[in-house]
């Protein structure tokens, strides 16, 4: 029984390593260029999307691509909401005392280690590192909002 299974597997092995059929390339679209979607509408590719390759298949054109999901654009209001949300989840902050202009040490009674933990939470939330020199200056939620908006080029 085992020999039959092994021989069947070995007989199919050359087919598994056969070269793929050659396909003529029609176009290569670079990021930030306009391309046709499968629905037939034109879309604008974002900067995080890889190059798009169109291949000719008899009878129709097929789009071969990999697209990454993109976050909706940031706004000052959205940044502020996310900053306050992260701060409200921090166990040493009383959500009732928290406002956009609350000073971490004077108003909320936090120490420097708490401030470092807050900055680390903001780095995780927004996906980029805040240098220590800049982090030392961020002492209230509004300063964090302004800093993130400046780094992410968000202006209203």
UniProtKB/Swiss-Prot annotation:
InterPro entries: ACP, ACP-like_sf, PP-bd_ACP, Ppantetheine_attach_site. The modification O-(pantetheine 4'-phosphoryl)serine is found at residue 112. One of its GO terms (biological process) is [2Fe-2S] cluster assembly. One of its GO terms (molecular function) is mitochondrial large ribosomal subunit binding. Pfam families: PP-binding. Keywords: Acetylation, Electron transport, Fatty acid biosynthesis, Fatty acid metabolism, Lipid biosynthesis, Lipid metabolism, Mitochondrion, Phosphopantetheine, Phosphoprotein, Respiratory chain, Transit peptide, Transport. Residues 1-68 form a transit peptide. Residues 77-152 form the Carrier domain. It is found in: Mitochondrion. Phosphopantetheinylation at Ser-112 is essential for interactions with LYR motif-containing proteins. GO terms for cellular component: mitochondrion; respiratory chain complex I. The modification N6-acetyllysine is found at residue 88. Mammalian complex I is composed of 45 different subunits. Interacts with ETFRF1. Identified in a complex composed of MALSU1, MIEF1 upstream open reading frame protein and NDUFAB1; within the trimeric complex, MIEF1 upstream open reading frame protein functions as a bridging scaffold that interacts with MALSU1 on one side, and with NDUFAB1 on the other side. The complex interacts with the mitochondrial large ribosomal subunit. Interacts with alpha-1-microglobulin chain; this interaction is required for the maintenance of mitochondrial redox homeostasis. Carrier of the growing fatty acid chain in fatty acid biosynthesis. Accessory and non-catalytic subunit of the mitochondrial membrane respiratory chain NADH dehydrogenase (Complex I), which functions in the transfer of electrons from NADH to the respiratory chain. Accessory protein, of the core iron-sulfur cluster (ISC) assembly complex, that regulates, in association with LYRM4, the stability and the cysteine desulfurase activity of NFS1 and participates in the [2Fe-2S] clusters assembly on the scaffolding protein ISCU. Belongs to the acyl carrier protein (ACP) family. This is Acyl carrier protein, mitochondrial. It comes from Pongo pygmaeus. The lineage of its organism: Eukaryota, Metazoa, Chordata, Craniata, Vertebrata. The gene is NDUFAB1.
């Amino acid at each position: 029984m085992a020999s039959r299974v092994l021989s069947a597997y070995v007989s199919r092995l050359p087919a598994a390593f056969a070269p793929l059929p050659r396909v003529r390339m029609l176009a290569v679209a670079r990021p930030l260029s306009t391309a046709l979607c499968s629905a037939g509408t034109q879309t604008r590719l974002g900067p995080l999307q890889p190059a798009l390759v169109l291949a000719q298949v008899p009878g129709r054109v097929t789009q071969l691509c990999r697209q990454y999901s993109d976050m909706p654009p940031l706004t000052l209001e959205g940044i502020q909401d996310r900053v306050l949300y992260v701060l409200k989840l921090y166990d040493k902050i009383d959500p009732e005392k928290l406002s956009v202009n609350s000073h971490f040490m004077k108003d909320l009674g936090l120490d420097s280690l708490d401030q470092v933990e807050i900055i680390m939470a903001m780095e995780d939330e927004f996906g980029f590192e805040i240098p220590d020199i800049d982090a030392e200056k961020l002492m209230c939620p509004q300063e964090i909002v302004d800093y993130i908006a400046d780094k992410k080029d968000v202006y209203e």
